[in-house]
UniProtKB/Swiss-Prot annotation:
Catalyzes the conversion of glucosamine-6-phosphate to glucosamine-1-phosphate. One of its GO terms (molecular function) is magnesium ion binding. The keyword Membrane does not apply. Its EC number is 5.4.2.10. The gene is glmM. Its cofactor is Mg(2+). This is Phosphoglucosamine mutase. Activated by phosphorylation. GO terms for biological process: carbohydrate metabolic process; peptidoglycan biosynthetic process; UDP-N-acetylglucosamine biosynthetic process. It comes from the Bacteria. One of its GO terms (cellular component) is cytosol.
Length: 429
């Protein structure tokens, strides 16, 4: 059986175990065969394994005659923007929100994550194990000006946004946004309070960032609004002036209304996933906005956006795509767009967020085993019975970890807990 290397967000694993320098070198060679004698832009987050993987994948690419432009530490959306500007391929070495021992390889082309068909083409070459011999050898060059190009592009997008006097708190997750976020907010006039801005590769996402938003909610002192990013900068979660966490669903709801009022919300449509909270769906419906759902993963959100013509979509986790700003989830751009909506309305973030219901939702991870099956009659009965009583049940394999995720949503938290435990017992039996 052919090995599946790519998950929902590139290749990912624990460095030295499921993700090695040898694999990265081969990915470089496989991608190099597809690229030909072009160039590939490479960026990374702050993980300690980033240097080693960067060297390995660069060696694979240059051995196939491809020039490699090294950006150093830079958010995933920044690399995506650079590949769009230069019409080239890109590689980001990052495991996004995962702990420091993980790392990953994301492949981009012309601003977008590569499609499943191209991932399959790379996997096929990895499985075959034999690569073309090229007479031309590529070069590795520093491309640190890529950071300035990205910052310049973001500032141009928000040239009319004046944040003078605004107090903003940022949690940079000790990750890639340490190179961009503070500078952009300060340039726009904000007074910035920063947490977790170390580039020590052992601290990324550790008790901080978008997967631990309570850290910022508890620690921010001066901010009227806070933003907490993940390790590679493609997610953001907000914190309001009352120190309440504002999740991705609520951010999407606020942006949807703001864009609609400006006449910028295409087809009055927003794209979410099967995990999008029903409270957001009900709120959008009241505002005359349609919600389309798709599979979990920002690549699938983007596919549905392109298919439907929507220009706003995202996930509860904070992956939010504003297509007339960026071709991928960009935490910094999302944060600035939210600030723009707040400034334009004159309202507080808490006032907006409270308007959007957030129905109780519990997610539990169950370690996946070979004998575990989702095609189970008892499981089907539980789901059908729960659904008939108004609960929404989603059971799916994670695209980035060896677990099955159980999510149940409804209006009675105690009943949700019972349903989650019942499903867990069936899966583990």
């Amino acid at each position: 059986m052919r090995v599946k290397y790519f998950g929902t967000d590139g290749i990912r694993g624990i460095f030295g175990e499921t993700l090695t320098d040898e694999l990265a070198f081969k990915v470089g060679k496989a991608l190099g065969e597809i690229v030909g004698e072009g160039k590939v832009i490479v960026g990374k987050d702050t993980r300690v394994s980033g240097d080693s993987l960067e060297a390995a994948i660069s060696a694979g690419l240059t051995s196939m005659g491809v020039d490699v432009l090294l950006c150093g530490i830079l958010p995933t959306p920044a690399v995506a923007l650079l590949t769009r500007i230069t019409r080239s391929f890109g590689v980001v070495i990052s495991a996004s929100h995962n702990p420091p021992e993980y790392n990953g390889i994301k492949v981009l082309k012309g601003g977008y994550k590569i499609p499943d068909e191209m991932e399959a083409e790379i996997e096929k070459r990895l499985e075959n194990g034999s690569f073309l011999t090229r007479s031309v050898v590529g070069r590795t060059k520093s491309f640190r000006e890529g950071r300035d190009m990205y910052i310049g592009a973001v500032l141009e997008m928000f040239r009319d946004l004046d944040l003078t006097g605004e107090m903003v708190s940022l949690d940079l997750a000790n990750g890639a946004t340490t190179t961009t976020a503070r500078e952009v907010f300060e340039f726009l006039g904000a007074k910035v309070e920063v947490f977790n801005d170390s580039q020590d590769g052992l601290l990324i996402n550790q008790g901080c960032g978008a997967t631990h938003p309570r850290f910022l909610a508890e620690e921010m002192k001066n901010g009227k609004v806070g933003f907490t990013f993940d390790g590679d900068g493609d997610r953001v979660i907000a914190v309001d002036e009352e120190r309440n966490v504002v999740n991705g669903d609520r951010i999407i709801g606020i942006l949807a209304v703001g864009l609609k009022e400006e006449g910028r919300l295409n087809s009055d449509t927003v794209v979410g996933t099967v995990m999008t909270n029903g409270g957001l769906e009900d709120f959008l419906k009241e505002k005359g906005i349609r919600l389309l759902r798709t599979k979990v993963g920002d690549k699938y959100v983007l596919e549905k956006m392109l298919e439907s013509g929507a220009n706003l979509g995202g996930e509860r986790s904070g992956h939010i795509i504003i297509l007339d700003r960026s071709t991928t989830g960009d935490g910094l751009i999302t944060a600035l767009e939210l600030m723009r909506v707040l400034k334009r309305s004159g309202r507080k973030l808490s006032d907006f967020a409270k308007e959007i219901p957030d129905y109780p939702q519990i997610t539990k991870n169950v370690r996946r085993t070979e004998r575990m099956s989702l095609e189970n009659e008892n499981l089907r009965k539980i789901v059908e019975e729960s659904t008939s009583r108004g609960y929404r049940v989603v059971i799916r394999p994670s695209g980035t970890e060896p677990v099955i995720r159980i999510t149940v949503e409804g209006k009675d938290r105690e009943e949700i807990e019972k349903i989650v435990e019942e499903i867990s017992r069936v899966l583990e039996s």
